[in-house]
């Protein structure tokens, strides 16, 4: 008898039940690893699988995380370049793709990443046909559309991380200006994740008090307090971080874990994430943009209808037209 057999006797006859809350992260770059560690530290899954084409980097990252198993409550951490390792995932987070270069717009990345998705998405679908797909790679709105098309999944099982992070940046900056915690500053950024995102000034409130009610000029050129600059900081924020440290990682990783938590814990929380917005806010084309959505066990179950001012609605339509202009040129 082996030491293990002397120590432990097996009671159960049938095969043990596999993972119930398995999460896969595709891509072990900066964003993938920040997402992975954020998910692990929030105890959201009972198995974490990681996939990447860079075998040595993948193996090293998996080992490094496994070495911390004692400090985690996720029993199984695995990784392989073969997608069979992802089988039966409840949720798959796609962070893989070409990295945004300094000064490069998110839209410029697009065809490079479409080609990568043509390999990734069918492999995910093959091994986890019932999973929820969360796209994080940029440009996220277009790539969420691409993932939806390539996967054949119903729209409630495909979402993009969208403006969840933009809204978090927005709330942080508003909090700085008012000396409040971001969670007490209720504010939404919708539309494109990136340069044409739309701040909903009309909905900005603290404890139910509308800030635009106190300052009707808020968000306009004529505002003496120049609140509009905050949105510019949100848009420039990512470029600034990329310029300073070469990439963004921590905030997007935490944002991803925030979304994963709402889904796996069936929280029915409302998040600004990327979904099919055709028919909403006057959008005619088949595009994905961020609007407030309810997230739970089944994925993206509902959309909240925001009351937008005419100019806010126009900005959403402009975003949609920009994205459609790029999308219709894509070869899928």
Curated annotation (Swiss-Prot):
EC number in record: 1.1.1.27
Enzyme class, UniProt record, top EC level: oxidoreductase
Compartmental location: Cytoplasm
Tree of life domain: Eukaryota
PROSITE patterns noted in UniProt: L_LDH
Catalytic activity: (S)-lactate + NAD(+) = pyruvate + NADH + H(+)
Gene Ontology MF: a single term: L-lactate dehydrogenase activity
Record-linked InterPro entries: L-lactate/malate_DH (IPR001557), L-lactate_DH (IPR011304), L-lactate_DH_AS (IPR018177), Lactate/malate_DH_C (IPR022383), Lactate/malate_DH_N (IPR001236), Lactate_DH/Glyco_Ohase_4_C (IPR015955), NAD(P)-bd_dom_sf (IPR036291)
Pathway in which this enzyme or protein is active: Fermentation; pyruvate fermentation to lactate; (S)-lactate from pyruvate: step 1/1
Main location: cytoplasm
Assembly description: Homotetramer.
Function: Interconverts simultaneously and stereospecifically pyruvate and lactate with concomitant interconversion of NADH and NAD(+).
Family from the record: Belongs to the LDH/MDH superfamily. LDH family.
Protein known as: L-lactate dehydrogenase A chain
Species of provenance: Eleginops maclovinus
Gene name, Swiss-Prot/TrEMBL: ldha
């Amino acid at each position: 008898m082996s030491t293990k057999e002397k120590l432990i006797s097996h009671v159960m006859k049938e095969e043990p039940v596999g993972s119930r809350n398995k999460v896969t992260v595709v891509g072990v770059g900066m964003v993938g690893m920040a997402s992975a560690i954020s998910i692990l530290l929030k105890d959201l899954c009972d198995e974490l699988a990681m996939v990447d084409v860079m075998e040595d980097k993948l193996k090293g990252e998996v080992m490094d995380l496994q070495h911390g198993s004692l400090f985690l409550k996720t029993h199984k951490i695995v990784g392989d370049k073969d997608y069979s390792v992802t089988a039966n995932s409840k949720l798959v987070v796609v962070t893989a793709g070409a990295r945004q270069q300094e000064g490069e717009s998110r839209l410029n990345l697009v065809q490079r990443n479409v080609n990568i998705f043509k390999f990734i998405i069918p492999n995910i679908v093959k091994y986890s046909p019932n999973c929820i797909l969360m796209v994080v790679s940029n440009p996220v709105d277009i790539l969420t559309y691409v993932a939806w098309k390539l996967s054949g999944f119903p729209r409630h099982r495909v979402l993009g991380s969208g403006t969840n992070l933009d809204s978090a940046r927005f709330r942080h900056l508003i909090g700085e200006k008012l000396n409040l915690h971001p969670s007490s500053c209720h504010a939404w950024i919708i539309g494109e994740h990136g340069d044409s995102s739309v701040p909903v000034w009309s909905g900005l409130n603290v404890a139910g008090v509308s800030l635009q009610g106190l300052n009707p000029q808020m968000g306009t050129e004529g505002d003496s307090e120049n609140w509009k600059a905050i949105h510019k900081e949100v848009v420039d924020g990512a470029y600034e971080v990329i310029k300073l440290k070469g990439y963004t990682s921590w905030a997007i990783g935490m944002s991803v874990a925030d979304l994963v938590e709402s889904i796996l814990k069936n929280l029915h929380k409302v998040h600004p994430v990327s979904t099919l917005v055709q028919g909403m806010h006057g959008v005619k084309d088949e595009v994905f943009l961020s609007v407030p959505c309810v997230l739970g066990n089944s994925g993206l179950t509902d959309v909240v209808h925001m009351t937008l001012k005419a100019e806010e609605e126009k900005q959403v339509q402009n975003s949609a037209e920009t994205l459609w202009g790029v999308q219709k040129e894509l070869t899928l």
